[in-house]
Amino acid sequence: MSDHDTLTMVGLTSTVPIEIVYASGLKPVDLNNLFICADDTERMVGQAESAGFSHNICAWIKGIYSVVVNRDLKRVIAVTGGDCSNTIALAELLERRGVNVIPFEYPRNRSKSDLAAELDRLRNTLSTSWDKIKTETLRLNRIRKKLLELDRLTYEENLITGFENHTFLVSSSDFKSDPDMFLRSWMIFLPRYGTEFRDRIG
């Protein structure tokens, strides 16, 4: 990963509204996906334990830590409320390494106004506007609409395999840091299922 990539990438410890990240000119990257797809997950867990994580903390948190360190990411959005409580310890260790940790909390009370305030705080932190966020939402929703149809064709019509479904849907948490590339990979995938299928979902 180049120096430019590390400066524009924002690691995500869990699902957040990526429209806000893209609207700020940055690229979200789902740290969970990078960890679980790595070839050396056991080594990464051991690396985190050597850095101070105890053995009884979940492997996911330790894997996320090692992904951030190994890829030299400079900025991480840490979901410290509504997700794994160990994310707080993760955030503290990353901050000690000089990583800019941006906390994000889903309100426990499920308050719409509290969630709106948290989203606005994230927007301010990333220095973007609601107009830009709305533009990104429209762009990403066009892709999400295709994924909804893909999901339906998996469980209702058995036209898409579970593996293919899983690959696309899990990757939509960050659209692999490049929605245009994600959409191109989608268009490459479609021809396997013939013209009628492409017309219905493309």
Regions found by a protein language model. Name each.
Residues 1-135:
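Trp/Phe/Arg-rich N-terminal binding region typifying the photolyase-homology
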